A protein has these predicted regions:
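Phosphate-ester processing/binding pockets and catalytic centers
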Residues: 1-218
Length: 218
């Protein structure tokens, strides 16, 4: 029975204040959701990358390493190791979707959770439909899992009724402090967000060809 694990995180915010620069009173202009997709039997491999990152830079594992707080050497090392992971394991994939928030219509802005859900569907539904069992692990502090209908129910309904897939979806929110797979996904989101928000392509180029990025409302 084919199964996969998907670790889901995001970068950016769901604010809509665009009359001031980002980080100076204004909201981010982009929102990125990233997914680390790994076969169930290989879910230990991305975790090893994060453990090596902690070891190389003498970081305490009880102090979560977040992309926003990493220096350039740490970021470069992660990107190089992530690239190597994909080279050695073609069934491990990195995916992301980026929304240009200034182009989001006003009535959609009123319910950010629905925007999250829609972005995640666009990003993952066709991939999920290839598997018998999908374990989805979002960070509840960032990915909003409730919006009237939960993200889980929304995706399961889409899989069964729209994609005609018999995929069984298991959604297990976890705190990223306790999950190295989510920390990996946080770093993926940071790489993609930096490419768009700050027009910084340096680290992103280290993963080009190994990360699939969907644009929304560009």
């Amino acid at each position: 029975m084919a199964s996969t694990v998907i670790y889901l995180d995001e970068s950016g915010d769901l604010g809509w204040k665009f009359d001031a620069p980002y980080r100076k009173g204004g909201s981010s202009r982009y929102l990125t959701i990233s997914a680390l997709c790994v076969p169930t039997e290989k879910k230990h491999l991305p975790k090893r990358v994060i453990k090596r990152l902690y070891d190389k830079f003498n970081k305490a594992t009880n102090d979560e390493l977040k992309w926003a707080a990493m220096n350039s050497d740490e970021r470069k090392y992660f990107a190089e190791q992530a690239h190597k992971l994909c080279l050695n394991h073609s069934d491990i994939s990195f995916r992301a979707i980026v929304v240009k928030k200034e182009n989001v219509l006003a009535h959609i802005r009123s319910d950010g959770n629905k925007l999250y859900n829609y972005m995640i569907k666009l990003l993952l539904i066709d991939f999920m439909a290839q598997f018998d069992v999908v374990t989805l692990i979002p960070d509840p502090r960032s990915i909003k899992v409730q919006s009237g209908n939960s993200l889980h129910d929304y995706l399961q309904t889409e899989l069964w009724f729209t994609n005609k897939a018999n995929t069984n979806l298991i959604t297990t929110p976890m705190d990223s402090k306790e999950c190295l797979g989510l920390q990996f996904s946080d770093m993926l989101a940071g790489i993609v967000q930096s490419r768009h928000e700050d027009n910084f392509a340096g680290i992103f180029q280290l993963l080009q060809g190994k990360i699939s990025v969907k644009p929304l409302f560009f």
